[in-house]
């Protein structure tokens, strides 16, 4: 059985609301930290989300 090459990560809002998304990413194809614009329901607008470690 092959091991999964994907790692669970947490995308945390830069707006300071404490909102976060969880997702997975392939460490071999994307070794750098992920930054993506997503909707923050607490701020009620699109903001940048940065990757942090999932505890």
From Swiss-Prot:
Entry keywords, A to Z: Ribonucleoprotein, Ribosomal protein
A single GO cellular-component term on record: cytosolic large ribosomal subunit
Biased composition (Basic and acidic residues): 1-11
Gene Ontology MF term list: structural constituent of ribosome
Biased composition (Polar residues): 14-24
GO biological process assignments: translation
InterPro entries for the chain: Ribosomal_bL33 (IPR001705), Ribosomal_bL33_CS (IPR018264), Ribosomal_bL33_sf (IPR038584), Ribosomal_zn-bd (IPR011332)
Region of interest (Disordered), residue spans: 1-29
Record keyword Nucleotide-binding present: no
NCBIfam families: PRK00595.1, rpmG_bact
Family: Belongs to the bacterial ribosomal protein bL33 family.
Protein name in UniProt: Large ribosomal subunit protein bL33
Name of the gene: rpmG
């Amino acid at each position: 059985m092959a091991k999964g090459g994907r790692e669970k990560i947490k995308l945390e809002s830069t707006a300071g609301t404490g909102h976060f998304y969880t997702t997975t990413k392939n460490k071999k194809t994307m070794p750098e930290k992920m930054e993506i614009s997503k909707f923050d329901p607490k701020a009620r607008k699109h903001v940048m989300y940065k990757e942090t470690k999932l505890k």
